[in-house]
Amino acid sequence: MNIINITNKSNFRFMYKKEFLKIMDIIQEKFNFKKRISVDLLITDNKEVRENNLLYRNVDKETDVLSFPFGDPDFFDHLDFIPLGSIIISHEKIVAQALEFNHSKKREFCYLFTHSLLHLLGYDHKEEDEEKIMNQYTKEIVEKLNIYR
């Protein structure tokens, strides 16, 4: 079983660990990882996300999610799992974006978690073609959980 270490500093009762582990299973299979994968997840508020965004990216604004990859998976050959990295999600942004896009918090959490995992694997959306690929992968993975808009 894949590993997710969750720290919840928000006032939101997080109920999606099962879905997040399924997302990790799909990622593991899709990208042919032979070992379990691991990720650290912090769920917090806009203030802490903004502080981390400024500290690590020199960007002084709130965002929905930050992803910090641990680097080349081959570096961890001696372990029985591959630590992909750390993810920070703003619960406040999740709630606001779920309302804005007219879907559930569950769908927004799962979508952003998947999006973040793809960032940990090196995917980005700075260019239009990269964004299309990343959005397509994210959509495909979330839909495998039968979670739609």
UniProtKB/Swiss-Prot annotation:
This protein's record includes keyword Zinc: yes
**Which GO CC annotations does the UniProt entry carry?**
cytoplasm
GO MF terms here are: metalloendopeptidase activity; RNA endonuclease activity; zinc ion binding
Query: Which prosthetic group or cofactor does it need?
Result: Zn(2+)
UniProt-listed Enzyme Commission number(s): 3.1.-.-
Q: What class of enzyme is it?
A: hydrolase
Keyword Metal-binding on entry:
yes
Main localization of the protein?
cytoplasm
Q: Which PROSITE patterns match?
A: UPF0054 (PS01306)
**Which biological process terms from the Gene Ontology are attached to this UniProt entry?**
rRNA processing
Q: Which keywords does this chain's UniProt record carry?
A: Cytoplasm, Endonuclease, Hydrolase, Metal-binding, Nuclease, Ribosome biogenesis, rRNA processing, Zinc
Q: Which residues bind Zn(2+)?
A: 115, 119, 125
Gene3D superfamilies on file: Metalloproteases ('zincins'), catalytic domain (3.40.390.30)
Q: Which domain of life is it from?
A: Bacteria
Instruction: List where in the cell it is found.
Output: Cytoplasm
Cofactor comment text: Binds 1 zinc ion.
The family assignment reads: Belongs to the endoribonuclease YbeY family.
Q: Which NCBIfam families match?
A: rRNA maturation RNase YbeY
The protein's job, in short, is:
Single strand-specific metallo-endoribonuclease involved in late-stage 70S ribosome quality control and in maturation of the 3' terminus of the 16S rRNA.
Q: Mind telling me what this protein is named?
A: Endoribonuclease YbeY
Record organism: Mycoplasmopsis pulmonis (strain UAB CTIP) (Mycoplasma pulmonis)
